[in-house]
């Protein structure tokens, strides 16, 4: 299945290096019931398209990929409409479907079946040529490496609170969050940062190595009372340094291009540049039953 993504990315971003691996796919699907939430389209023994849908409550999210050599066969529409039915059966009132920004074929398809574009996301990257500097933390804050036994519950709560004002954020309970993060084969507490103000967690990062072809900043957050004090820049510098010390020379992250926190501009100032882009499309669903 990773060959489908590699072929699609190469056709859309010929100058970008494609690095989606089987391990990346396993991590992305770690929280899914594969029988219920994923679909694979085959032509004989060859995978020509696949995707997944997930969600709770009124909003579900889908994504699908079709090998560029197989465009025009109705595979994308089959995946999209199947996910709509799955989401509606699960109680969804709306569904989001994300496609690569330059994928005109997928964008036309979604528009033709009733979707509208609602948001743009970017993957940003940086190549590290030298050891990143040690970050400077604002007065009164102290940074430490994540300790699962000591920090897990409070970290999850702080992350959930920090993302509460993010666009269309869906909170995850501690059990689900733990499965994705703490039970992952890529979990390395040395790549996580916990920033405290007194006894409270004010900010933090979750990073993983060997993800999408390099180090990856999965989560970077600052709780609202501590925003606008330079913590985000310090967190990013700390993430770069941890990943560098772990042997990574390329670092990536995903960002809402319209984030109210100004995250996109923060990452640009740190030297990161957009490598890939996705457009989120939305459709209202009719109730089933």
Specify the residue positions occupied by each region the protein language model found:
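Catalytic cores of nucleotide-enabled group-transfer and carboxylate-activating enzymes in metabolic
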Residues: 15, 21-25, 33-46, 88, ...
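A short, internal acetyl-CoA/4′-phosphopantetheine-binding micro-motif in the GNAT/acyltransferase core
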Residues: 40, 54, 63-73, 220-227, ...
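Short amphipathic alpha-helix that is part of the acyltransferase structural core
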Residues: 1-26, 136-171
